[in-house]
A protein has these predicted regions:
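Charged linear interaction tracts used for macromolecular binding and regulation
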Residues: 83-84, 117, 138-140
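Short clusters of small/polar residues that mark proteolytic maturation junctions
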Residues: 41-42, 165-168
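Conserved phosphate-binding loops in N-terminal lobes of ATP-dependent enzymes
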Residues: 12-99, 104-108
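Glycine-rich phosphate-binding loop and adjoining helix at the ATP-binding site
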Residues: 93-133
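N-terminally biased helix-coil "hinge/interface" segments that flank
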Residues: 32, 36, 50-53, 71, ...
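Glycine/Thr-rich phosphate-binding loops that ligate phosphate moieties of nucleotide
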Residues: 74-83, 115, 167-175
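Extended hydrophobic/Leu-rich segments
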Residues: 98, 123, 150, 154-157, ...
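Gly/Thr-rich phosphate-binding beta-strand-loop-beta motif of the actin/hexokinase/Hsp70
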Residues: 1-25, 29-30, 135-166
């Protein structure tokens, strides 16, 4: 088993393994004649082939049929699965600590956990990304995603930190 941290943010997904390997990919997917391409390769073709590209699949992670049919993806979960497979392929028997944004809905988290299990990878824990990144003196944490930002208010009691509230700020993303 190789322990790794997988941080989910549709602007930049980060995978950091205990063996020192780090992988960063943007949340873009592109359908070509061989299958789904993700990350920077998909980002580079998004401008020339927008009808075959998607950058909303992490933000809108679901199993609803795509408006435009693609040969290798029925829904956003297929695109997320392809990207997870690509990212985790280099790690032998991954055991993941999953860092997710507060904006992830319960249904989306359920889909994500199922996708990771199908890769296959083992999940050893799930933590809110704001809690993982914040220092004890931080009261607010702003995570900027591709399509939105999430402002998380943190509460510190002694050595413990917890989330008191979070707010999604639509259209305040990188895109």
């Amino acid at each position: 088993m190789t322990l790794a941290l997988l941080h989910i943010n549709d602007h930049r997904l980060r995978l950091a393994a205990e063996n020192g390997e780090t992988l960063i990919e943007t949340g873009f997917s592109h359908s070509d004649h061989q299958g789904l391409v993700s990350g920077s390769a998909a980002y580079e073709t998004a401008w020339t082939k927008p009808h075959l590209s998607n950058n909303r699949f992490w933000h809108e992670l679901n199993q609803k049929p795509l408006a435009r049919k693609l040969k290798y993806a029925r829904h956003h979960a297929d695109m997320a699965y392809a990207q997870l497979c690509k990212m985790l392929a280099s790690i032998s028997s991954p055991q993941l600590l999953l860092s997710v944004p507060a904006s992830l809905e319960n249904e989306q988290l359920s889909i994500l956990l199922g996708l990771i299990k199908a890769v296959p990878a083992e999940i050893c824990g799930v933590v809110d990304g704001a809690l993982l990144a914040a220092q004890p003196e931080h009261k607010l944490f702003l995570e900027i995603q591709l399509h939105q930002a999430v402002l998380t208010q943190l509460e510190t009691t002694g050595e413990n930190q917890k989330i008191s509230t979070h707010k999604k700020i639509p259209k305040l993303g990188v895109s």
